[in-house]
Amino acid sequence: MLQTKKYQFWFCTGSQDLYGDECLAKVAEHSHKIVDALNASGVLPYEVVWKPTLITNELIRRTFNEANLDDTCAGVITWMHTFSPAKSWILGLQVYRKPLLHFHTQFNEELPYDTIDMDFMNENQSAHGDREYGHIVTRMRMERKVVVGHWSDPVVQGKIASWMRTAVGVVESSHIRVMRVADNMRNVAVTEGDKVEAQIKFGWEVDAYPVNEIAESVNAVSASDVNALVDEYYEKYNILLEGRDPEEFKKHVAVQAQIELGFERFLEEKNYQAIVTHFGDLGALKQLPGLAIQRLMEKGYGFGAEGDWKVAAMVRLMKIMTAGKKDAKGTSMLEDYTYNLIKGKEGILEAHMLEICPTIADGPISIKCQPLSMGDREDPARLVFTSKEGHGIATSLIDMGNRFRLIINDVNCKKVEKPMPKLPTATNFWTPEPDLYTGAEAWILAGGAHHTAFTYDLTAEQMGDWAAMMGIEAVYIDKDTKIRDLKRDLMLGEVFYR
């Protein structure tokens, strides 16, 4: 399972010295208890670290500077226990460069009706202080997440946990490096994009390598290593010979084992976390990487087909954001292939020639070797399966020429009515929200690609928050989408995102 760095989030409480030492001691005590409770909840994927109460301009600026410089800090959570004059926060906020969450909570859950007095009112002013602080953040046009509710509420804790995963995605984005083993498929538009702008906006480094350079790494893998991995395949997966000679079949599988090991070693040596290939540029490779790529995705690598580096980076990003999640259902590249248009049963059959991540599989996973008309190579081995049912999101990051746009569609995955015995690929089948017809029309109007980065384990809100923190446009297609409203939003986006 993919593991990320043990990130922390700093909990910074605002106040001022106007209230005196006794009050400030209670502020510190309360914020300590909140941090301890959040960490003990079992809901948060990362640790919250208490920081001393911030009461002066210089302390605030120093704390935010330290957060910038601490590689383990993925973001700051702020809360105003008392009133904290917001001009004190300007210098700190100006220098801050990481994700920010404004936690609008208070220590007590219920009004102490019988005992409340002005001392209590002065000490517990979150409703007052958080508005002052919120004003200056808005005036400074800073992107931040606001979570409202009592700190003991599991729903509120879940919102913080959700934001943490997005924040880690923002921080980790600048560490994503994509290896292009092949260029973009000839004459295809949507998989193109400005790689320099992607590095400016997202921090992604996208580099090209000759396919035969990585093929040398593949050829250097020893026979003993290949045989050991093939044995692992045969133990883990069903083997569907379908009339093929067992020894001949195994040789095809061994080619993919050699590719997996060679690719992984090359990626590790060069420090890349995502890869793209193209069936039109295979060089000395004996097969189009299929099973090998599926296994690499399962280990956490991003992948994009036909040179689609944006999808490769997004798949890697989403795997990072979901790393370590309990009961995760999976993340993969997918492609819109063909429709079922029977009334009441509408949906899109999602697949690709070979490369669908087995993390989304439901039930048995099998190895098949079938001819592939594209690539002019040996019959490639691949994993075949059907995917889990349930809700997910399909995302498409596109280059609009003057900016990037992230399209996010809520989809509902289901089983197809009948087996498809002649289809030698892994598949998913979903109906986009609000329905196939509106969803497909909206997707096309927004400019969405035929390749998607798909996951069961993130929400549209999380990916929209990521887009907002990255300063790019997000277009949502969900149960509430109306085409007239979507067209208006797209026109407004043209004006705002210049």
Regions found by a protein language model. Name each.
Residues 3-26, 175-184:
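Short beta-strand segments enriched in small/hydrophobic residues
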Residues 25-41:
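Short catalytic helix/loop segments, enriched in acidic residues and glycine
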Residues 46-47, 104, 109-244:
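Cap/lid and interdomain-hinge subdomains that line or gate substrate/regulatory clefts
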Residues 376-498:
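Extended hydrophobic packing segments that form well-structured cores
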